[in-house]
């Protein structure tokens, strides 16, 4: 077997049939990374029958001063990691290729599950696992960065997904917590809908992300990042951005209708009881009346609040948005956020539900909420994020982690010293600005 360079078409033909394919291993993703001076390499391992049995899209970037290259195969390689002989052959051939290209190491973070977990994060007894894949990589000299509970260097190691292949939307909804279904119905009554934005509306999404990053204290990307993503991923159907909007006129109309229906129900009950038509004991009769009266008062206050909201925001207002990537086996939620000013409407439920619908209707294998942590203790500051995703049903996914295949130990160690020093200085500079 030998490693060969593939043209983009041949690589796509191989990659799209591979069970581990993600948007990371596409020409479109490579083109996006070109903006930051990454160069794409498409390679495949060819057997004696001229068949490609393993492959990868690998990115390289020339390091300053030393003029050596670092390599990264995002969510690669596309190979059966449990086949040690195949992995060994591919590794040895790739080493030669990377060395020839002046590379000092190649980083991988395969889209391969380590072991099966349920919705609570528990390991499933007698469930599937790929522990041999980890052992094979370590035996072949790959530097393993450990079973991190948080995010790896570049990509999440823990995710939450809903299986959607050959399932109806009703099937999926049955697995959701009752509270989640209630919120979805409530949002519909409130006039919350979603729509896909255009490129010209990217500043709207950027504004959502800025408010979210300020609130949650993470660094957001510039508008140019989202523009580059759009330009490289949208036309091929990979990228879709949905925003949630509330229509206060619909919210008002539905509230008025609910109030009128409740008033009608109350009047009919009293009339039927007075005429002896309704057979109901006094305790139940009074309890039902009290409940309706409280509902009417609540709806009256709600109508007053809606008038205030209309005065402040107009007829409609944007609540939040999510950037979805749709490719291969799944619909994935990559970036998302919401405005704090109207958080009470919980628009994230509605937008994620639209993502679930896309996965079901497109018969994808799954809907991927993407990153969570592997720390399922209530004390974990990010536990609430996990609970939110868990409420939709599904299960936890743990990947096999991150690895470096070192080609030159000297230059690899030099790079890491320089890299760590750079980030220390950057953090000091950042802290001085505060």
Segments the model singles out, each with a brief description of its role:
Residues 3-49, 53-66, 115, 141-156, ...:
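A conserved beta-strand-loop-helix scaffold within acyl/acetyltransferase catalytic domains
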Residues 31, 42, 310-311, 371-434:
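C-terminal catalytic domain of photolyase/cryptochrome flavoproteins
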Residues 47, 66-67, 77-119, 125-128, ...:
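Intrinsically disordered, low-complexity, positively biased terminal segments
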Residues 67-152, 319-321, 325-392:
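Acyl-donor binding region in acyl/amide transferases
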Residues 74, 224-226, 354, 419-420:
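Juxtamembrane/interface motifs at transmembrane-helix termini
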Residues 103, 239, 364, 397-398:
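Secondary-structure boundary/capping residues
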Residues 110-111, 147-150, 197-200, 371, ...:
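Acidic carboxylate-rich catalytic motifs and surrounding loops in phosphoryl-/glycosyl-chemistry enzymes
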Residues 121-132, 155-171, 409-434:
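A short, hydrophobic/aromatic-rich structural module that often spans a beta strand
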